[in-house]
């Protein structure tokens, strides 16, 4: 009887071990089929988020860590907002790079300007806004920008050599009550809304009832930036601060130089097209 029980137990043990081995092989086969997500394979799944188009991609970093990069449309069709899912400059911090010559303080900005078609770069708290040259295709720019962002965040390098918070709305000792109220309203009500669209708004000064502001990021060259200033920012400032008479957009030397170069390029391109269209067609008989 004891011998029979021993044989039965041995048979059960062998069957259990065989089943466990097969199960292990099956799971091993499943695990071996998992492949890292290729950054340049496909564009992910598009879905609607309110009135904005959002695109999400899963990107495989070193080890088991994943980065989810989303793209979001902005009111400016020439600008696109990239959200890497991690902190970029942190809450309350922004940095504008209107041209490649201004990117010397940021390794990431330098790499982004190497992507063909990129005209301007803007860093926000948790997003990166890319503005493209007119005529450039997002379908060609986006994969390269995805690759740059992924590689950079995997490297662990600093985004800025020296990161400093915005100082334009810092309350100073010589600020009067009106200026303090303007800065407070910009920081608490206006700036967060503008940053949602991939840009920023900077306080440049207040004099004789006129508030001077500078638009950055996607808002700097947005066709509706003037409407935003007049119908949005100006109305809100006037509602809370009766001393405000109007709001003006300020352009610095870099903005003017960039606009001048772009206009010169457009003139040359137009002249070249007119010259080509005026040239006689070849292949005629003598």
Curated annotation (Swiss-Prot):
Localisation per UniProt entry: Mitochondrion
Q: Where does the transit peptide start and end?
A: 1-66
Residues noted as binding [4Fe-4S] cluster in the record, renumbered to the chain: 219, 222
InterPro entries attached to this UniProt entry? FSCA_dom_sf, Nfu/NifU_N, Nfu/NifU_N_sf, NIF_FeS_clus_asmbl_NifU_C
Keywords, A to Z? Answer: Iron, Iron-sulfur, Metal-binding, Mitochondrion, Transit peptide
A single GO CC term for this protein reads: mitochondrion
Query: Record keywords: Iron-sulfur included?
Result: yes
Q: Where is this region: NifU?
A: 182-250
Q: Which domain of life is it from?
A: Eukaryota
Question: Which Gene Ontology biological process is one annotated for this entry?
Answer: iron-sulfur cluster assembly
SUPFAM superfamilies per UniProt: Fe-S cluster assembly (FSCA) domain-like (SSF117916), Hypothetical protein SAV1430 (SSF110836)
Which GO molecular function entries does the Swiss-Prot or TrEMBL record give? Answer: iron ion binding; iron-sulfur cluster binding
What does this protein do, in the record's words? Molecular scaffold for [Fe-S] cluster assembly of mitochondrial iron-sulfur proteins.
PANTHER family, alphabetically? IRON-SULFUR CLUSTER SCAFFOLD PROTEIN NFU-RELATED, NFU1 IRON-SULFUR CLUSTER SCAFFOLD HOMOLOG, MITOCHONDRIAL
Can you say what this protein is called?
NFU1 iron-sulfur cluster scaffold homolog, mitochondrial
Organism annotation: Drosophila ananassae
């Amino acid at each position: 009887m004891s011998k029979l029980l021993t044989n039965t137990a041995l048979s059960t043990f062998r069957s259990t071990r065989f089943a466990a081995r097969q199960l292990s092989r099956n799971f091993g086969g499943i695990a071996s089929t998992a492949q890292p997500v290729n950054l340049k394979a496909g564009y992910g799944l598009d879905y609607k988020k309110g009135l904005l188009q959002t695109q999400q991609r899963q990107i495989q970093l070193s080890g088991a860590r994943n980065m989810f990069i989303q793209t979001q449309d902005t009111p400016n069709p020439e600008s696109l907002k990239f959200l890497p899912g991690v902190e970029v400059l942190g809450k309350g911090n922004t940095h504008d790079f209107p041209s490649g010559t201004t990117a010397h303080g940021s390794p990431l900005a330098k790499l982004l300007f190497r992507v063909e078609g990129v005209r301007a770069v803007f860093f926000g708290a948790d997003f990166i806004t890319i503005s493209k040259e007119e005529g450039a295709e997002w379908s060609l720019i986006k994969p390269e920008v995805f690759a740059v962002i992924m590689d950079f965040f995997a490297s662990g390098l600093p985004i800025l050599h020296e990161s400093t918070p915005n100082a334009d709305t810092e309350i100073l000792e010589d600020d009067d009550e009106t200026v303090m109220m303007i800065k407070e309203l910009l920081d608490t009500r206006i700036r967060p809304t503008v940053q949602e669209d991939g840009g920023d708004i900077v306080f440049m000064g207040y004099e004789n009832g006129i508030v001077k502001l500078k638009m950055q990021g996607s808002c700097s060259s947005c066709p509706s930036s003037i409407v935003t200033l007049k119908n949005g920012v100006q109305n809100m400032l006037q509602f809370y601060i009766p001393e405000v008479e109007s709001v003006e957009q300020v352009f610095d030397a870099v903005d003017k130089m960039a606009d001048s170069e772009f206009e010169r390029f457009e003139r040359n391109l137009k002249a070249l097209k007119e010259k080509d269209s005026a040239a006689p067609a070849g292949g005629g008989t003598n």
